[in-house]
């Protein structure tokens, strides 16, 4: 599937009736959810409507890369609006490969797990070259403070809320303000079970708030996961009750 508009993105959800033969998606243009001024934009087609996080058992690959001659460009998703009682993010849950996604100014509120890319994982996943961040100009950060939450849920992570499966993260970062009811992590909110988690050449620069625990890269790990962090760093601010 080729993704060029917000409605194309929404149609990746199983609820749209997307053919089961479609297992891959390629984003080829910037996607803007607010103030587009376009007749076929999200605001015009669905005024006041929030984005429903994508759930699709068959979709296992998403890439945001466009080749321009010998160079490549990575289209951006701007101001993704999510407000859900379940898990929330660009994807409700995901398994497979996410590559080169650019998520700018995402506002995600979830009753369950919340993550910029995925609220939770439902299978082994690789995240490569992805970015979740805020823009000082587009997101009007001069009028906001570190108390303005952009990603919130029972568990919150800059990239992934809850990880219960093997996960590899490479060359990715998150820079936002997160609040977790129990856990909040710059990249991953919570890891559970006996899993292998490998994070390389990645970082988080976030404000993190939680009633339980926070972590610059990983909010909490319960179980006997094998975690490797290589050439990573974290910055920002953390506030937790535990």
Regions found by a protein language model. Give the residues of each.
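Surface-exposed repetitive/solenoidal architectures
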Residues: 1-242
